[in-house]
Amino acid sequence: MSKAELKRLGDYIREVNVRNRDLKVTNLLGLSVSKEFMPSIANTIGTDMSAYKIVERNQLVYIADTSRRGDKIAIGLLDKYDNAIVSQAYTVFEVVDHEQLLPEYLMMWFRRPEFDRYARFHSHGSAREIFDWDELCDVQLPIPSTTRQREIVAEYETLTNRIRLNNQMIQHLEATAQALYRKTFVDNIDKENLPLFDIAEITYGFPFNSELFCDDNTLSPIIRIRDILSNKTETFTSEQVDKKYEINDGDILIGMDGAFHMTIWSGGLALQNQRIVKIVPKKGKYVSAYQIFYSIYDTIKQLESSIEGTTVAHLSDKDMKKLSIIAAPAKIQEESYSLFKTINKSVITCKKEIIKLTELQSLLLAKMGQKKATER
C-alpha cells in the first residue's frame, strides 16, 4: 500500500485529560501488553485518587513508556465499562469523529505486531524509552469507508466471540472433570495413595541450545515454560533430540521455575525444553491425565506458595518423588478413566479450535495493511 493511500492518525484523534476531581469514579484499571484492561493491583492506600484520569467508554489509553515490556506497547480500548479511572501516567485519547474512524477498527490496528514494532522503533530515551504523543499522531494507517471498517470489525468480533464460547466450554468441561474427580476419588470411597512414579512416566526437559531458537515454523516447535498455559508456541529449533522429549496432546506439563504453571497439553506434537517436567500415565494403569492433574494440583500450588516471597521458586526431582495419586478400587478406576478420557478429548478439541481462531484473527490483522482488504 502506497503512502498516498495512508492517513495520518493525528488528524483523527485527540488527547483527553479529565481528572477524577469529585471522586465519583472508583473503578481503577490497569493496562497490559496483551492490550486488555484489568483490575489494578496497585496499593492505593493514602493515594490522592482525584488526580487520576477518567476514561469513558470507546476512549483509548496507552502507556508511553515502552521499556521492559517485551517489545510490546500497552494500549487498549475501554469497551467493557461505561467509565473507569487510570493512572495519571497513562495517556487517554479518543477518536474525534466516529463517522470517519471507528474506535474498534483503530484498536484492531493497534493489535498488529507491526504496530508494536513501530512503537518500539520510534521510542526514545536513555533510562526510559518513550513513545510520545507526537509519535503516535504520526502513525500512518489505511482508513477505508466506515461501512468497510464495520465489516472488518464484525469479522474480527465473530472470531473473538467464538474464542470466548470455546473458553466457556472449556471451563464447563474442566469443572465437570473436577467434580467427577472429587466424587470418585475424594468423597465416600476406600482409597489408597500411590506414588506418582509408579503410575506415570516422568520426563525432565532437554537443555536445548537457545542460539538455535527461531521463528521458522518448518522446523520443530519447542515448548518453554512461558508456553505452557497458552498451549502453543512461536519458537522453533533445528536441533534433533531423543523421542522421549516429544510432547503429545494429553501429556501433563509443569513449569519448574517461577510460577509452577500446569496444563494438560493440547498444542500438538512439540519438543520439551529444560525446566519443564512431563507426566504421562503408564499404559494399563487406568489412570487418566485428569486424575493425575487434580491429584497433584493442590500440592504443587502449595509448594509454589511456600517458596514465593523468599526466592525464585524451583520444583525439584525430590519434590516430584514426594507426589502421590489417589487411587480408587479397580472397577471405579476403570469407569472413571473412560469418562475422563471423553472430557479430555472435548477440551483438546476446544483448545485446538481456539488456536485456529487466533490464527485467523492474526491473518485478518495482517490483511489490514493490504490494499485489497480495505477496498470494497
Which functions belong to the PLM regions below?
Residues A84-A89, H124-V153, A270-V277, G309-Y337:
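A short glycine-rich beta-alpha junction/loop motif
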Residues G10-R14, I63, T91, M107-R111, ...:
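Generic alpha-helical structural context detector
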Residues E5-Y62, F197-L212, T218-D251:
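Sequence-specific dsDNA recognition surfaces
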Residues Y12, P103-E135, V287-L323, R376:
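Short, positively charged
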Residues L6, P103, A177-Q178, N193, ...:
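Alpha-helix initiation and N-capping motif
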Residues R57, V61-R111, K243-I300:
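A short beta-sheet element
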Residues M1-N20, D138-P207, I326, A330-R376:
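Non-catalytic DNA-recognition/assembly elements of restriction-modification systems
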